Structure formats: C-alpha cells, structure tokens
C-alpha cells in the first residue's frame, strides 16, 4: 500500500474527538511529553511515572465515558492528584522551574475542574 492510500485510510478512520475533557487530556499529554524529554537520566523513573500517569488519565476518561462508572471518574481524580505529586517532586529535585510547575498545574487544574463538573452533571441526572 502506498503512502497516499495509508493517509486516506488514516483520515477516514481518525476518531472525531467530541468529548472535551478527552481533548484537554490529549493536549496535556502532548505538553507533558514535549517538556519532560529533557529530564536527567537519573530521574528517568520519575519522568516515566509522569508520562504513564498522564496516559492513565486519558484511559480512565474513555472508560468513564463508555461504562458510566463512578469509580472510573474517581480514578481520574486520583490520577490527577498523583500526577500533581510527581510534578511537585520534580520541582523539589530542581528538575522543573517554578514557571513550568505553574504551567503544568494549570493544565491539571483544567482537567480536574472538567472532571468534577462531569461528576455534578451525572449526579443531577
């Protein structure tokens, strides 16, 4: 299969992201991956935890949307809190600047607000 056909197939089957919280999580993942690639090798485990947890947030968003389970929504909040903890640890180890930590925190705050609004919406049904 040539490249043009593959591109056409990809465009045809690319998912249309209608869930705003998932869009926000994907944006956060891209930001985190871009900005953690310069972590020192001795903090590789911390970097991997940060990236892994950000993917877990997106996975749990999709699970909560599909299965409509309150536990999946709670797991999103837990993952956001854990990710915030990992980022604070990176700041304490002087891997992240204060400016970067604030930037990461703003992304997480947006996700947290969206998740909690989702909780309230589901409870009001």
Predicted regions located by residue number:
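Amphipathic alpha-helical assembly/interaction segments
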Residues: 1-125
């Amino acid at each position: 299969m040539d490249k043009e056909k593959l591109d056409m197939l990809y465009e045809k089957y690319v998912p249309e992201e209608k869930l705003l919280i998932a869009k926000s999580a994907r944006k956060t993942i891209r930001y985190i991956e871009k900005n953690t690639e310069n972590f020192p090798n001795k903090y590789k485990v911390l970097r991997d935890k940060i990236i892994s947890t950000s993917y877990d947030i997106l996975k749990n968003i999709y699970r909560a949307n599909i299965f409509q389970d309150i536990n999946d929504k709670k797991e999103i909040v837990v993952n956001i809190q854990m990710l915030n903890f990992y980022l604070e640890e990176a700041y304490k180890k002087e891997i992240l600047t204060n400016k970067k930590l604030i930037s990461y925190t703003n992304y997480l705050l947006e996700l947290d607000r969206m998740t909690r609004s989702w909780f309230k919406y589901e409870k009001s049904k």
